[in-house]
Amino acid sequence: SDAVADGDHAISGVVDS
């Protein structure tokens, strides 16, 4: 959900798939 690029990670409020 709404993944935001953070270096080489994907940060999201809720991790879904």
From Swiss-Prot:
* GO cellular component terms listed in the entry, alphabetical order: extracellular region
Name the domain of life this protein comes from: Eukaryota
Main location per the UniProt record: secreted
Tissue/organ expression: Expressed in skin glands.
Compartments where located: Secreted
* Keyword set, alphabetical order: Secreted
Q: Please state what the protein is called.
A: Septenin 1a
- Organism from which the protein derives: Osteopilus septentrionalis
